[in-house]
Amino acid sequence: MPSAPQKTKSFRLQTKYVFLTYPRCSSSAENLRDFLWDKLSRFAIFFIAIATELHQDGTPHLHCLIQLDKRSNIRDPSFFDLEGNHPNIQPAKNSEQVLEYISKDGNVITKGEFKKHRVSPSKSDERWRTIIQTATSKEEYLDMIKDEFPHEWATKLQWLEYSANKLFPPQPEIYQATFTEEDLQCHEDLQLWRDQHLYHVSVDAYRLVHNVTLVEAHSDLVWMDDISRNLEGLEPGSPPSTSADQVVPERQHGPEASEGTITGMGPSTSLSMMTTRPTTSSTTSPSNSSHSGSN
């Protein structure tokens, strides 16, 4: 029993903007332009652009954009066939984008005047636009997408959150101080700290200048601090100083001189004060004087 003949797909082209592609076409762009211009004259054709593009094997194929003044109603699938070359036929939804695409290599010929036309947005685009324009917060934006486009919400949530942050940038948090203004006030005795640290001559620094023992250096510094405080034993007009290379007044030694702590220009922290007024020497430290002896 013979098989029933297969039904051919019905063809119908209803549009004012047509995009044709002739693969491996042996005809020239000029022949195709003239052929289509004549064939579409009943639809009041006003623009046509044809571009030639080469395949990797060197054979050409032709792209064609057609703009009509009247909507076509073509039912014959072979309507655009030229010399045995059958094209791929599509409506050109956006003539400007099609013309830009076929002109990318610059090998294009045209006839007539190109006209931009309004491109009707898809229903999906309209729904997205409504969400973008009506949402008032990031949460509402994502909820609306979840309702309208659940598949996109489930598979592209990371990108949707990115767009939500662009539409509704996070507001910076107001800084709340964890301390009061009173905490910023300095309560330390800076003068005492200055005297004990900035104007302080250490035992080690003193011994770098004077060849004395650790005990002698300690004793000398305590004695100099006492002298600086009461201004005794210094020449008139000489300011007190604990500089390690100063000319130090000579003094007599006693066991009490080794007591106390090392101090600087601040208040004396000696555990005992000298009661004997020392004699002065213009060339040696107190310890050096004691080492040289006296007659």
Curated annotation (Swiss-Prot):
A motif (RCR-3) lies at residues 101-104. The keyword Ion transport does not apply. Keywords: Activator, Covalent protein-DNA linkage, DNA replication, DNA-binding, Endonuclease, G1/S host cell cycle checkpoint dysregulation by virus, Host cytoplasm, Host nucleus, Host-virus interaction, Hydrolase, Metal-binding, Modulation of host cell cycle by virus, Nuclease, Nucleotide-binding, Nucleotidyltransferase, Repressor, Transferase. Disulfide bonds: none annotated. Divalent metal cations, possibly Mg(2+) or Mn(2+). Residues 12-114 form the CRESS-DNA virus Rep endonuclease domain. A motif (LXCXE motif, interaction with host RBR1) lies at residues 184-188. Residues 267-295 have a biased composition (Low complexity). A divalent metal cation binds at residues 53, 61, 63, 105. Residues 163-175 are annotated as: Oligomerization. Homooligomer. Interacts (via LXCXE domain) with host retinoblastoma-related protein 1 (RBR1), and may thereby deregulate the host cell cycle. Part of the C- and V-complexes which are RepA-Rep-DNA complexes involved in the c-sense and v-sense transcription. Belongs to the geminiviridae Rep protein family. Implicated in enhancement of V-sense gene expression. Acts a an inhibitor of C-sense gene transcription. This is Replication-associated protein A.
